[in-house]
């Protein structure tokens, strides 16, 4: 049966998916709390703070809808029937100048990642020592170039050969041993294609399953490569354990609000260039050890600025995501590409937290795109 998710105006990647994924993250953690008893169960405050954060995220979405409708006459619930897929191109069709530039940028990102792995002298996925050294300046530049370029390329040009570039980049970034980069590549590309192609449900399901497999495989292999850690959990149990542990760290962040007083956000923005890790500060502030750990999307803001800072952060994320979502429903191209990137990275933040300077850079670009569109906007979508 050829059923398409877009029929009936069902929007799979609406910003509200962040709420759904956060609840799913909680559910994944529960076996380790209530059945395996591997970790201490959280108190009520954890659920309260998560609920408040998600509520303000929804407030941001609602405000975006109001502003776009009232001030810019933009229909924020655009019918998917108005969506047009990019024109199909064969391998031998003429390449425009812009397409060649994008292919060149994607290829440059791939080349830089190959150079990065070659300079490391091995594959970081299979070596904890190499993985600790893999996030070099070359790696950062390659990721900043590759992720936006491949998504814009997929959004603008419907040429099957571009999927090969996507696959090559995905494999190379997976070999660094980090889960977040290959997941961001796969998820952002899926979101971009969802809004620019007529995607059959079976391919969406296959893509989601592939993302889950990559998440399990990269995470499990990377953990097994750490010689000083010994795990008896299988890959699925390990995911549940990590979710429960991360949420327990959030509980500690709730208890230790204002501990870092803005230093965590400052380190996030500058740490890559000063060789300091914001997640180590999270470890020091929550468990009292010099250890790099994650604290969910809510934790860092709580440690820096307390509950008010966390609520403002969630409100702004909801506002930005929904505004870009509404704009990309109309204009596609680069707007869809960056919506895919920001939504994918925000979903990843549900576990890791906003402690990556590159994601804040993408958010800054997203804000500039919104301003650029709205300055010339008086549209009726």
Question: Can you describe what each PLM-predicted range is?
Answer:
Residues 148-152, 180-181, 188, 192-196, ...:
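Hydrophobic alpha-helical segments involved in membrane association or supramolecular assembly
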Residues 127-132, 213-322:
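Small-residue-enriched transmembrane helix-hairpin modules in multi-pass membrane proteins
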Residues 76-91, 164, 169-184, 271-284:
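Cytoplasmic juxtamembrane regions at transmembrane-helix boundaries
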Residues 80, 157-230, 320:
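Hydrophobic alpha-helical segments of polytopic membrane proteins
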Residues 1-164, 199-203, 217, 312-313, ...:
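Membrane-anchoring hydrophobic segments
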